[in-house]
Amino acid sequence: MIRNFLNFLWNNTSLRFLIINTIIFAMDKVRCAHLLLKHTGSRNPVNRNTGMPVTRTKEEAVSEMKGYLEMLRKSDNLDQEFRRLATAKSECSSARKGGDLGFFDRNTMQKPFTEASFKLEVNEISDLVETDSGVHLIYRIA
């Protein structure tokens, strides 16, 4: 009975097209969290969590983020530590959710962010990624 149903689905050209495209669409998304540090040259140099203007230079943001990256790479529980750090330090409103940005496709985020996100394996952290928004660390959740 199940085999007949699957054959029906597969033999129906419209349904086959829908099934294949649904699978491809689902596979072409990632779920990531990030930690964002803004700097005076950022597109909007305001901390989204405090409403305060950001006064650090780009070099200071990079230096601070390198410290976080080193700490995360030494962590025994990357997922938990990343979310804790993103909640405490990220200047994006996603900090309230441990930096979780949810699922997104290749056309949602800024190009450098997208490229880095899609290169990551699940449970992997990026190197520093610079965008117009600031300096990011990206953690791929799914």
Curated annotation (Swiss-Prot):
Signal sequence extent: 1-32
Gene3D superfamilies: 3.10.50.40
Organism encoding this protein: Theileria annulata
InterPro entries, per the entry: PPIase_dom_sf (IPR046357), PPIase_Pin1 (IPR051370), PPIase_PpiC (IPR000297)
Protein name listed in UniProt: Buparvaquone-resistant peptidyl-prolyl cis-trans isomerase NIMA-interacting 1
Keyword Kinase: no
One Pfam match: Rotamase
Subunit structure: Interacts with host FBXW7; leading to FBXW7 autoubiquitination and subsequent degradation.
Function: Peptidyl-prolyl cis/trans isomerase (PPIase) that acts as a key virulence factor by promoting host leukocyte transformation. Binds to and isomerizes specific phosphorylated Ser/Thr-Pro (pSer/Thr-Pro) motifs in a subset of proteins, resulting in conformational changes in the proteins. Promotes host leukocyte transformation by binding to phosphorylated host FBXW7, disrupting dimerization and promoting FBXW7 autoubiquitination and subsequent degradation. Degradation of host FBXW7, leads to stabilization of JUN, which promotes cell transformation.
